């Protein structure tokens, strides 16, 4: 990583800039602006931020059913008994759930794989939550699985693999409509595109 340290700046500030610069989407200039903002911010605000970040590591875990982020045994979605129990939407990462929930057109449950099959990176079906998904389909409650993996090479490979596993079970397998450009990650798609992709999902 490019050295972003400033010779005329205190070591503690340089350390903060370096740490912020390691966050996704934060470049050197943004890291500097955030660091100097935090220096000027009220102490209470900075301490609240610090405590919140610490609590993520200490209090946040994975839902035992869908593997979404949770601060108890089940995530809020799996706790909601009013959702449609006959549908499971499969996504790659927890942030994909946030994107789909924001659209508000899907009322079923989710399953988070925590990745996608990628032989070039050494990620196989055993490295993501596929076995757990198959176990959820054994109770006969689910009649549709929506494959909402990202429209990337890895996402498509994962969707194809899942389709081959699930179809023999007699469960309908659908894929988000092609309104999503290839190579786009779900969390960055706009609401209208996501809504149309969910409503126009097709048999896979």
UniProtKB/Swiss-Prot annotation:
Q: Does the keyword Magnesium apply?
A: no
**Cross-referenced InterPro entries, in alphabetical order?**
DNA_Rcmb_RecR, Rcmb_RecR, Rcmb_RecR_Znf, TOPRIM_dom, TOPRIM_RecR
Please give the function described in this protein's UniProt entry: May play a role in DNA repair. It seems to be involved in an RecBC-independent recombinational process of DNA repair. It may act with RecF and RecO.
Q: Which PANTHER family match?
A: RECOMBINATION PROTEIN RECR (PTHR30446:SF0)
Give the GO molecular function terms: DNA binding; zinc ion binding
User: Species name for this entry?
Assistant: Dehalococcoides mccartyi (strain ATCC BAA-2266 / KCTC 15142 / 195)
Boundaries of every Toprim domain copy: 86-181
Q: Which family does it belong to?
A: Belongs to the RecR family.
Superkingdom? Bacteria
User: Do you know which Gene3D superfamilies this protein is assigned to?
Assistant: 3.30.60.80, 3.40.1360.10, 6.10.250.240, RecR Domain 1
Keyword Metal-binding assigned: yes
Protein name (record): Recombination protein RecR
Keywords attached to this Swiss-Prot or TrEMBL record, sorted alphabetically, are: DNA damage, DNA recombination, DNA repair, Metal-binding, Zinc, Zinc-finger
Chain intervals annotated as zinc finger (C4-type): 63-78
Starting at the broadest rank, the lineage of the source organism is: Bacteria, Bacillati, Chloroflexota, Dehalococcoidia, Dehalococcoidales
Q: Could you give a single Gene Ontology term from the biological process aspect?
A: DNA recombination
């Amino acid at each position: 990583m490019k050295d972003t340290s400033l010779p005329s700046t205190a070591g503690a500030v340089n350390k903060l800039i370096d740490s912020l610069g390691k966050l996704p989407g934060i470049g050197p200039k943004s890291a500097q602006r955030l660091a100097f903002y935090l220096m000027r911010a009220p102490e209470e605000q900075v301490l609240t931020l610090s405590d919140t970040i610490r609590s993520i590591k200490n209090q946040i875990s994975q839902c035992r059913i869908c593997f979404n982020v949770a601060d108890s045994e089940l995530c809020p979605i799996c706790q909601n008994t009013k959702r449609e129990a006959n549908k499971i939407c499969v996504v790659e990462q927890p942030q994909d759930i946030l994107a789909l929930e924001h659209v508000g057109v899907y009322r079923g449950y989710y399953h988070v794989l925590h990745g996608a099959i990628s032989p070039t990176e050494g990620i196989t079906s055993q490295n993501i939550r596929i076995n757990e998904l198959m176990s959820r389909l054994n109770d006969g409650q689910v009649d549709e699985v929506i494959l909402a993996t990202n429209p990337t090479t890895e996402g498509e490979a994962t969707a194809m693999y899942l389709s081959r596993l699930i179809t023999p079970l007699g469960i309908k397998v659908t894929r988000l409509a092609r309104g999503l450009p290839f190579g786009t990650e779900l969390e960055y798609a706009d609401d209208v595109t996501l809504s149309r992709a969910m409503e126009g999902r097709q048999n896979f």
